[in-house]
């Protein structure tokens, strides 16, 4: 297993945070009816991919991408719940649990 260094992990955390911001802004843009929020969402996605590109310099691509996607989805679910009162049904919860279990398995491999 590859030993992780601080800077790649910091860039991965930044990538996850920017992805969450992008998703929230996209929802708030109301299908790009609020253009500035839509533009900020696109800029956040660009920043997220740029941070992910830096993260994969020190973290294996499969691990970094799985962590970025998985944590991004889980945190977006939480943000949707808190900010927009969106709830998952039982199938959604099962999917989220499987996603998190898959992330753990990839990291342990």
Curated annotation (Swiss-Prot):
Protein location: Cell inner membrane
Gene3D superfamilies associated with the record: 1.10.3730.20
UniProt GO BP: glycine betaine transport
One Pfam family, short name: Multi_Drug_Res
Keyword Transport: yes
TM annotation in the entry: 6-26, 36-56, 64-84, 88-108
Paired cysteines (S-S): none
Principal location class: membrane
Annotated InterPro entries: Small_drug/metabolite_transptr, Small_multidrug_res, Spermidine_export_MdtI
UniProt GO molecular function: amino-acid betaine transmembrane transporter activity; antiporter activity; choline transmembrane transporter activity; spermidine transmembrane transporter activity
Protein's membrane topology: Multi-pass membrane protein
GO cellular component: plasma membrane
SUPFAM superfamilies in the cross-refs: Multidrug resistance efflux transporter EmrE
Similarity field: Belongs to the drug/metabolite transporter (DMT) superfamily. Small multidrug resistance (SMR) (TC 2.A.7.1) family. MdtI subfamily.
Assembly notes: Forms a complex with MdtJ.
Job of this protein: Catalyzes the excretion of spermidine.
PANTHER family reported for this sequence: SMR FAMILY PROTON-DEPENDENT DRUG EFFLUX TRANSPORTER SUGE, SPERMIDINE EXPORT PROTEIN MDTI
Protein name: Spermidine export protein MdtI
Organism: Yersinia pseudotuberculosis serotype IB (strain PB1/+)
